[in-house]
Amino acid sequence: MTHKQRAIFEPTLVRTALLDAVKKLDPRVQWRNPVMFVVYLGSWLTTLIWLAILSGHTTGSAMFTGSIALWLWFTVLFANMAEALAEGRSKAQAASLRGVKKTSWAKKLSEARVDAPQEKVSADSLRKGDLVLIEAGDTVPCDGEVLEGGASVDESAITGESAPVIRESGGDFSSVTGGTRVLSDWLVVECRVNPGETFLDRMIAMVEGAKRRKTPNEVALTILLVALTIVFLLATATLYPFSVFSVEASQAGSPVTITVLVALLVCLIPTTIGGLLSAIGVAGMSRMLGANVIATSGRAVEAAGDVDVLLLDKTGTITLGNRQASEFLPAPGVTEQQLADAAQLSSLADETPEGRSIVVLAKQRFNLRERDLHSLNATFIPFSAQTRMSGVNVQERMIRKGAVDAIRRHVESNQGHFPPAVDDLVASVARTGGTPLVVAEGSRVLGVVALKDIVKGGIKERFAELRKMGIKTVMITGDNRLTAAAIAAEAGVDDFLAEATPEAKLALIRQYQAEGRLVAMTGDGTNDAPALAQADVAVAMNSGTQAAKEAGNMVDLDSNPTKLIEVVHIGKQMLMTRGSLTTFSIANDVAKYFAIIPAAFAATYPQLNALNIMQLHSPSSAILSAVIFNALVIVFLIPLALKGVSYKAMSAAALLRRNLWIYGLGGLLVPFVGIKLIDLLLTALNMG
């Protein structure tokens, strides 16, 4: 599945949105939006007054009252349609996800062995902890962890990426997702979720927004809008007795009608942002999905907009991530070939790019052929985040390679001595931005393998943009401080954490949060889970482990760590859109005030005609023009609410100034022009 962004006013979406907008006229739906609920009540009230005029139960202009009632209903419908369009785009995305989810069968195993007895069962009957065998051509029946085997898996149904990926037991690529398909070989998988709780089920629920809760900022803004609505409601309510008293005192004009007061109230309360607020939130999650990122809630998207510290893994995010062995640097008393032989032996079972490159370099330099570890009766020691080294035990030899501090501890624990000359070699490699990998055999240090990595093109400029926005970037790496400092300087990050362990990451996040900062990070391994759970915005890689995906509040389907920067941009754009439209909505009130107040009270107080600076044709056309503009502006702003305002990297103060000029001044001027044009049209049509 590819998450292609659909056109905002695509005919099928518009038709569905129109039907949904009418369905949302149900009062049980309307009361959830307090601002628009006031407009909804005003629509019913003016409609009843219009019917009373038609039936002769009261006096007044049926044409004027009916027109006001009609446009108030349009205001409610347009607000409903904005939300329905946003939800419609999400529902279309959910429908394509449902197409991926289909009934399949599973080979349930009694034990975690490929040759264990198996039973054919429906995938829907599988429970957490069940074991299944998945062979070439089979659909993965559940989300789970690979316990045995390795296979090529087609994940295009979930990620949109056509290239197959390798899933195998152990390491950070042991997670499989229900709905994907095994292309070759076999896997023994333990199911980690029950039916209805799979990643695909959660994706569908998230993008549908069926259980969308308001975010903290959305709640705060709603409280502000409700407060403004109450203030304007009280102010409008006092105008009726004031009008009656004024008419009696001056013996001129007539009291303001309920219809005019309702029109005034609707034009003064912040209906523009009130009608678009929900659509902005839904569209934010939809834009995140368009970037192939699944957010667990709008709360996560909003938090991304408030982030001011990014923790970025060096490998794959800042550098290309394909570090290659470039040189063997032997310790005193050791030949380069001896070092190459030991380094190659320790890397024969190492499937990392670094390990494979060491094997290749040893072949190229000294014609050292690969050896079969099984025939040598060798035991491979895999790398772990805790030991920060790997190696091999072969016959009487105990070879280890890893970070300088890890090898130092290993050598000293074996009563060995770490030569100062090797420290010099390590510093020399690190100063040039390379990564020194120290090799030792038993208690003897053999030397250093220099690994070279390349900083991604354009990454320095992206970090400069983030700095303009007030976001601090911190590089996380397992390299020593010298290497980390060299790469950090080249990439242009603000700070770095060298020789990082899972505990150090967690401590750093807590330190920043204690300072009142919001932290974002990415991760893919089980060892990243505690830090992901602690971070305010935690983007787990889809290729990572189940534990990492459960700990994060977002999942990147492309498994691209650099995506974190784009996630922050989308979050900030959503917050900016909400703020910009709020500014525009409140600024709108000024022009409507100049339109309606003179029209309502000039007959009693002729001096108020001085406020009719737009020279509107008549009181009725002035009021109707303001109400029509109030409804139409929602329609014109729907594309902006769904797409988001244009985003540029700059400081918060500069952004505020820019948006005040565009949306504050625009909100003041546009209604003057719009209301005057509508008044001219109504006059030309003899409706004023």
Swiss-Prot record:
GO terms for molecular function: ATP binding; ATP hydrolysis activity; magnesium ion binding; P-type potassium transmembrane transporter activity. The active site is at D313 (4-aspartylphosphate intermediate). The keyword Ligase does not apply. PROSITE patterns: ATPASE_E1_E2. Mg(2+) binds at D524, D528. Its EC number is 7.2.2.6. Gene3D superfamilies: Calcium-transporting ATPase, cytoplasmic domain N, Calcium-transporting ATPase, cytoplasmic transduction domain A, HAD superfamily/HAD-like. NCBIfam families: ATPase_P-type, kdpB. This is Potassium-transporting ATPase ATP-binding subunit. It comes from Yersinia pseudotuberculosis serotype O:1b (strain IP 31758).
